[in-house]
Design a protein with these regions (language model features):
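Tandem amphipathic alpha-helical repeat scaffolds
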Residues: 1, 13-30, 54-70, 93-109, ...
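Generic long, charged, amphipathic alpha-helical segments
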Residues: 192-226, 294-298
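TPR-repeat structural position
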Residues: 31, 72, 111, 131, ...
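Helix-turn-helix DNA-binding segment
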Residues: 286-289, 293-341, 345-350, 354-367
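TPR/TPR-like (Sel1-like) alpha-helical repeat modules
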Residues: 237-252, 261, 271-278, 289
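Amphipathic alpha-helical segments of tetratricopeptide repeats
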Residues: 2-7, 39-50, 80-90, 119-130, ...
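Inter-repeat boundary and helix-capping residues of tandem alpha-helical solenoids
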Residues: 9-12, 52, 91, 131, ...
Length: 368
């Protein structure tokens, strides 16, 4: 409050206070406030003879804001100069900048680049013997492995990870214990899910007591995901509604998308309920849609379409009706309808127009 109400410009002597406020805003899940505070930190860096370290830290927090709001191009453009800043490594934030940048590239569909960044950070920290940073980096490595479908690698990390103690400050961009809970849920075993449930319950109490809203949101979302995969759909919606209500003021989007497709069904039910968070839920679902398109492009979904479906898709693109398509291909209208429904399902579309747009986005169709 003192910084916000200060009559004059914030000076270099107040830099530690501004940095502390950045972390407070982050843990409070107040992305708008964090953006403002990070601006102040960048200005201090500019005033202090272009202090590269101060500018790098300000860019780190700006990058977090842009990433969580799913503004991926802005996040990348903001983080790259922070990583290149000569004093960033001395500040100790270079690894954290690298973690967020890797998440950006993963979200952009550049999985190999994301993996290369994290693996390079782990190798560097192993050489330098920086134990605390390596601890976080290996958790990030496991998190990325899980997101890229390399469950065995994530499971190997989990086998060697002790979640205790849970009493420490969660102030960076990820929490290793939450990665562990995700691995246990992904394993699909009853024992793993039971362990995940107990850990998440402990973390919920710890984070609520510390007013750490940022990671409380993620814990609630993971609890909803766990309940969803266990078939407890009503409970999943109730818990997820709490998470979304906490996330909406700050505009958090990526937090949900990064947890995976299991959250889509309860999010859709929340959206249909048309509550006070319906608009924000729509933004999250739209980001899930974008994520699927990126992933689908990597997996070449076009290969899943049959030759007949591809022919029908091309005819849909030139706006032929079902009757015209049946005459063109000498098949019944019922057969056209069946193939069209298969096309919609494979492209996750709900209309002809949406199917054609997605097919063009995935380079299944071209205008030529």
């Amino acid at each position: 409050d003192a910084l916000a109400r200060a009559p004059g410009p914030i000076d270099e002597c107040q830099a530690p206070l501004v940095a502390a406020l950045c972390f407070i805003d982050w843990m409070a899940a107040d992305l708008s406030a964090l953006h403002w505070t990070a601006n102040q930190y960048c200005r201090i860096g500019e005033i202090a003879s272009g202090d590269a370290g101060g500018l790098a830290l300000g860019r780190y927090f700006h990058g977090l804001v842009y990433y969580q709001r799913n503004e991926l191009a802005l996040a990348e453009a903001t983080l790259l100069p922070a990583l290149a800043a000569p004093k960033a490594p001395r500040l100790g934030y270079r690894t954290e900048v690298s973690f967020v940048l890797a998440a950006v590239y993963q979200a952009l569909g550049q999985a190999d680049r994301a993996r290369q960044i994290i693996d390079s950070v782990c190798a560097h920290l192993l050489r330098t013997g920086d134990g605390p940073a390596l601890f976080r980096a290996q958790a990030r490595q496991a998190d990325l492995a899980l997101r890229q479908g390399r469950l065995d690698e994530a499971r190997e990390w989990a086998r060697n990870f002790d979640p205790d103690p849970i009493h420490f400050g969660y102030r960076f961009s990820n929490v290793p214990q939450l990665t562990l809970a995700r691995v246990w849920i992904a394993e699909g075993s009853g024992e793993g899910r039971e362990q995940a449930g107990r850990l998440l319950q402990l973390l919920e109490g710890e984070l609520a007591a510390r007013c750490n809203v940022r990671f409380l949101i993620e814990v609630l979302a993971l609890q909803a995901m766990l309940q969803q995969v266990q078939g407890e759909t009503t409970a999943a919606c109730e818990v997820l509604a709490r998470a979304v209500a906490l996330a909406q003021p700050g505009g958090f989007i990526r937090l949900f998308v990064d947890l995976g497709q299991e959250l889509v069904p309860p999010l859709k039910r929340l959206h249909l309920a048309r509550g006070s968070s319906a608009r924000h839920v729509a933004h999250i679902l739209s980001a899930f849609d974008d994520e699927w398109l990126v992933s689908a492009g990597r997996q070449q979904v076009g290969a899943d379409l049959t030759r007949r479906e591809l022919k029908i898709l091309k005819l849909l693109a030139v706006r032929l009706s079902n009757v015209e398509i049946s005459e063109e291909l000498c098949i019944s209208r019922a057969t056209v309808k069946r193939h069209t429904q298969n096309i919609y399902r494979k492209l996750r579309a709900s209309s002809r127009r949406e199917a054609v747009v997605r097919a063009r986005t995935l380079n299944i169709l071209t205008d030529g």
